[in-house]
Design a protein with these regions (language model features):
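Metal-dependent phosphoesterase signature
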Residues: 45-78, 91
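Acidic, Mg2+-coordinating phosphoryl-transfer loop and its flanking beta/alpha structural elements
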Residues: 143-185
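Structural recognition of alpha->loop->beta junctions
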Residues: 109, 113-124, 178-198
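Hydrophobic anchor at the start of a short beta-strand
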Residues: 92-94, 118, 144, 163-164
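Active-site neighborhood of HAD-like aspartate-dependent phosphohydrolases
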Residues: 1-57
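Substrate-recognition "cap/lid" segment bordering the active-site pocket of phosphatases
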Residues: 100-145, 151-155
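Substrate-recognition element of Asp-dependent hydrolases with the DxDx(T/V) motif
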Residues: 70-71, 79-110, 121-124
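Surface-exposed amphipathic alpha-helices with a cationic face
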Residues: 83-87, 139, 158
């Protein structure tokens, strides 16, 4: 009998993309940015970095989001342990990430190197549509639960999927408003979700 499945977002749930953002800035410009607001949702607001006005600087920054970056994004504290607990309780874990397809294998290597018990990553891309770019993947997987930290990614998901929102970075968070009705439960982090899910 197949194991019950839980789908997990990567950035903001398993991995700290905001911390990785600071490392990219340092690689691109040679200076590690100071932390401006540890409670900021968006990396640009968390770190004391200037807005890049010219295309050359923007391209220089973007070019450092390369394979070596996607293989080395830091794990969020407690996320590996939360996944191990879910895995040991009999759940099959799949990562569904709004990442461009060329970085899918690098993302899986990143997760495996941290010790996440995850053997599959689905990179959906991030096309701006009325429904979540992850909706088709979630419909195909039909997981018991889907955990994400970005409220718009719950748009258009199958009604039977338990939608769990990670409420990180309250300052400037998009996780507000009427669309909170799309969420079945909310948690401070993945460890708190695991506590909730395993206590049912």
């Amino acid at each position: 009998m197949p194991k019950p499945l839980i789908a997990l977002d990567a950035d903001g749930v398993l991995l700290d993309l905001s911390l990785g953002y600071a490392s990219v800035w340092e690689r691109a410009f040679g200076v590690r940015p100071a932390e401006r607001d540890p409670e900021a949702y968006w990396p640009f607001d968390r770190w004391a970095v200037e807005r890049l006005e010219d295309e050359a600087s923007r391209a220089r920054f973007r070019n450092h989001f390369d394979e070596s970056f996607w293989e080395a994004v830091p794990a969020i504290d407690g996320a590996v342990d939360a996944c191990v607990r879910l895995h040991d309780a009999g759940f099959h874990l799949v990562c569904v990430s709004a990442l461009d397809a060329p970085w899918q294998a690098a993302r899986l290597r990143n997760l495996r190197r941290h010790g996440f018990p995850i053997e599959r990553v689905i990179a959906t891309g991030n096309a701006g549509t009325a429904v979540s770019p992850k909706a088709d993947a979630i419909a195909e997987l039909s997981p018991e639960a889907f955990v994400d930290d970005y409220l718009p990614y719950f748009r258009g998901l199958p009604a039977q999927v338990h939608t769990a929102l990670i409420l990180r970075g309250p300052n400037g968070s998009p996780n507000v408003g009427e669309e909170l009705r799309l969420v079945r439960s909310s948690h401070a982090d993945l460890a708190a979700f695991a506590d909730h899910w395993l206590a049912r």
